[in-house]
């Protein structure tokens, strides 16, 4: 094997790598005379071109100052940077060019163009120059044939023309791999392996990398640069190109939410779901307040008002209907006692105006309503067989018929009202004597109160407990002037728009009250207080009592009026007893004697 040895000569400070002196010993000698000024200009031009590196790898010449290099061919390489040692010789040995051709993308060459394998020793010049000496990257035919330098120059001219046309930077990694020399190596060195050139479009390359033009490679001298850190991890070329070419997605903007983040009611921004539907905070609060307050809205248009972010407050009726249309569930809204508390016991109310109604009055008022409904005739089963609206009816017939009709209506209502009283919670727990006393004392009051609530005073219809419907004029001869007071009371009572729950409480309070001769007045008073509290809670929370502060007082004020009407009824019975046209029934006679105030 022929041995080729090249030596660096000392060069002046600041000289370019292409102008270094070389000595070649084997079959011939080449001196620095071959490096003509045009080649020196070639190196200087490449050094000054606008070639920017897109990677942070150190220049190749930096490594060549401190390591011995051996060429070998392998697949795409890993970069392993050992710690630099002292300056040493660089050895290139045993290059198998046929193996190199198998892994490279260069076109095959003939054996005449292949250089002989051997060893080339590079020794640092003395004294060392501040510039990094140039190095021979590959064995090219130019060392065997002087004419190849001319071919190399032609390739460079073509390459320079292509570099000027295409300026788009492309990230490309070096085609060399480095590894630590095995132990026992006399000098601190690393192994360098040359991989096949990577065929990519020609663009400005990083300094010190290789350029491929028409299947041939050439080395670009690396300018003097500061040595970089040696602690790079392994990196594959394919992975690096994917990382550099992949565009990093920008983070989503907060100001432009997707359709999934819009309110289903008005289209405003919505962070999460409320009451089963993704809605904004405004529509959530509107829906909650409407359900908790049981608010009733009225649309001033055609009930199809647009509901969007700008016009959602114009029509509350259409906004609430749209909340229901998109699927918001009213049953999910928590009551006032659990407002704002998830899975925790309700605390004391924040203000005295918003107490929560206790559960026992709720069950009490339900029982009172049930008792009232069961003791009243259904509107579909009323008896109009004796109803006559003829004003001359009061002049016809005998007085005994009208008086007997009066007694029959009282006795028929007595059994129905007694059945109603027995369904009041707590009434049957009282002593029997107290039950009878309370019932007999309040019978006429209950008769008038229930009759006034059922009847229609505007049309003059009076509906009694047994379902019989009579005109007011049909009752004048039997009831006397008492019927006019009952109709007037009925008109005033219905003008108050009392609901069935409040009326059930008023009817119970008319009977459960303090009477003279009670055995256990304390128990009666306790039951009375329960009913009063139940009525108060109902009026406050469910009947708009907050907007009508005197409404409860007006309801309780009807009880003294009933006492006055009861006295008028006793006077009518007393007059009929004196007239003695029709003897009163025994139960009516007993009722009259037991309820006399004197």
UniProtKB/Swiss-Prot annotation:
Compositional bias per record (Pro residues), positions renumbered to this chain: 352-361
User: Zinc fingers (NR C4-type) span which residues?
Assistant: 263-283, 299-318
Which Cys pairs does UniProt list as disulfide-bonded?
none
Q: Where is this motif: Nuclear localization signal (NLS1)?
A: 338-350
Q: Which SUPFAM superfamilies does the protein's record reference?
A: Glucocorticoid receptor-like (DNA-binding domain), Nuclear receptor ligand-binding domain
Q: Which residues form the signal peptide?
A: none
Q: Enumerate the subcellular locations listed in this protein's record, separating them with semicolons.
A: Cytoplasm; Nucleus
Q: Name one Pfam family in it.
A: zf-C4
Known Gene3D superfamilies for this protein? Answer: Erythroid Transcription Factor GATA-1, subunit A, Retinoid X Receptor
Q: Which parts of the sequence form the motif nuclear export sequence (NES1)?
A: 443-452
- Cellular component GO terms held in the UniProt record: cytoplasm; nucleus; transcription regulator complex
For this UniProt entry, the molecular function terms from Gene Ontology, in alphabetical order, are: DNA-binding transcription activator activity, RNA polymerase II-specific; DNA-binding transcription factor activity, RNA polymerase II-specific; nuclear glucocorticoid receptor binding; nuclear receptor activity; protein heterodimerization activity; RNA polymerase II cis-regulatory region sequence-specific DNA binding; zinc ion binding
Region Disordered, residue ranges:
1-22, 337-361
Family listed? Belongs to the nuclear hormone receptor family. NR4 subfamily.
Q: Which protein is depicted?
A: Nuclear receptor subfamily 4 group A member 2
Q: Which gene encodes it?
A: NR4A2
